[in-house]
């Protein structure tokens, strides 16, 4: 999705008003994009306030769009204009290779702190020997379930998608019969956006259908196992998942689950602390497990997610901006965010921290899920990844919405990807 140049100019013209000041006026004023709504924004606000008090600088918050697709479009237009309006930006795990030319090298400021973080993420954030972003938190898709409902109906957490469908249908129908007409079996992210790419990569991988392209950049998505995965997911729509799921993002799915109206949910780790919050209807009733396998011969798969923080090379205060990045990605801040917000740390030592594990018991039992998550193929497809992902999520959405069969959609997708690739990614 593209943001018009006129819209960008409007944003740029009013950006000073869009920012909310969080400290007194001193040395430098650093503007940061790091949280859009709710808990995410509040954590961003608190952390930047703390840094401002420690350093005497001023921090202003810019609230980015909620959609990752829209955020990237906005940043790209700001980079094209060489705008200095934003000093620090939040960077999705698949973006570093796409925007590397617009970010400063953080190594002169990190003092080796990156060595504490997961090496694979640091490598992802390194381009041409430059550390262009610091890991902020990592993510991997998880299965949330109502452990009280499973126990009530004599079921266990499913290990395959087939088991999930059967259990979801059984409990959904029973709960509706008992009076909850709004009960759904399974909610997830099926809107046509990057979140659907994440979900669908998990489905493909779990059935042995590979990824959109392989590590060498070869287009592999058009295969029978991938078709099986998408056909299976399409069978959920209107049976165990509401048709409205075709317009669900993460927060839409969480809203249904947290209101007590879903048996299962696919979402990121952040949903744990919110689901167990004071205003949640299902506090203490949530279980978490790895996402199911694609049949008995399949495997568990979780898409790698997560966010980084980086400094724009157009910033007028790179040293101060880098200082803020290093503070926000530090062990002390990551620990606090893990305990209070269930944000997965990118620092391995924190997965052995008692306070972190007490707040998030699944961090220990599902540690392997987080360290072996499946990447989207941004490295293999380079600057063309946004086109690749958009083609994939649109093809998947066509299958889920019944507009095309999995086989036809994947064949068409293969042709589209060949056009995008041409001679090389």
Regions found by a protein language model. Give the residues of each.
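Hinge/lid segment of periplasmic solute-binding proteins
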Residues: 92-140, 156, 181-182, 196-199, ...
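Extracytoplasmic "Venus flytrap"/periplasmic binding protein-like
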Residues: 31, 47-119, 124-126, 148-159, ...
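Conserved C-terminal helix/tail region of periplasmic/extracytoplasmic solute-binding proteins
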Residues: 53-54, 58, 151, 371-425
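Extracytoplasmic/periplasmic solute-binding protein
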Residues: 132-136, 141, 165-218, 262
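Glycine-centered hinge/linker elements that transmit conformational signals in sensory
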Residues: 168, 215-246, 291
């Amino acid at each position: 999705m593209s943001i018009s140049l006129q819209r960008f100019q409007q944003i740029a013209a009013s950006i000073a008003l869009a920012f909310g000041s969080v400290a007194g006026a001193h040395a430098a004023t650093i503007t940061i994009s790091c949280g859009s709504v709710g808990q995410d924004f509040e954590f961003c606000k608190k952390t930047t306030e703390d840094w401002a008090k420690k350093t005497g600088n001023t921090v202003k918050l810019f609230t980015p769009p909620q959609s990752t697709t829209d955020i990237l479009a906005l940043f790209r237009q700001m980079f094209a204009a060489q705008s200095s309006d934003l000093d620090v930006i939040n960077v999705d795990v698949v973006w570093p290779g796409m925007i590397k030319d617009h970010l400063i090298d953080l190594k002169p400021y990190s003092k080796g702190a990156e060595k504490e973080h997961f090496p694979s993420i640091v490598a992802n954030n390194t381009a041409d020997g430059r550390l262009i972003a610091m890991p902020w938190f990592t993510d991997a898709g998880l299965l949330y379930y109502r452990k009280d409902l499973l126990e009530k109906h004599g079921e266990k957490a499913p290990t395959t998608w087939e088991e999930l469908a059967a259990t979801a249908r059984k409990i959904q129908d029973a709960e509706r019969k008992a009076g909850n007409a709004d009960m759904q079996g399974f909610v997830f992210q099926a809107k046509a956006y990057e979140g659907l790419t994440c979900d669908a990569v998990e489905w493909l991988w779990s059935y042995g259908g590979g990824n959109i392209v392989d590590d060498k950049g070869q287009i592999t998505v058009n295969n029978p196992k991938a078709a099986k995965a998408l056909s299976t997911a399409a069978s959920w729509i209107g049976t165990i998942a509401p048709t409205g799921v075709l317009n669900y993002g993460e927060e839409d799915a969480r809203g249904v689950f947290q209101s007590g109206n879903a048996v299962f949910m696919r979402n990121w780790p952040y949903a744990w602390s919110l689901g167990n919050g004071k205003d949640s209807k299902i506090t203490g009733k949530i279980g978490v497990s790895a996402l199911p396998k694609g049949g008995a011969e399949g495997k568990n798969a979780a898409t790698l997610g997560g966010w980084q923080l980086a400094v724009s090379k157009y910033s007028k205060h790179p040293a101060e901006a880098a200082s803020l990045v290093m503070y926000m990605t530090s062990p002390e801040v990551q620990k606090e965010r893990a305990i209070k917000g269930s944000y997965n740390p990118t620092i391995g030592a924190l997965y052995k921290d008692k306070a972190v594990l007490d707040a998030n018991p699944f961090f220990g039992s599902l540690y392997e899920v987080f360290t072996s998550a499946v990447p989207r193929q941004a490295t293999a497809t380079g600057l063309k990844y946004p086109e690749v992902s958009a083609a994939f999520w649109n093809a998947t959405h066509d299958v889920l919405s019944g507009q095309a069969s999995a086989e036809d959609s994947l064949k068409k997708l293969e042709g589209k990807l060949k056009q995008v690739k041409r001679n090389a990614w």
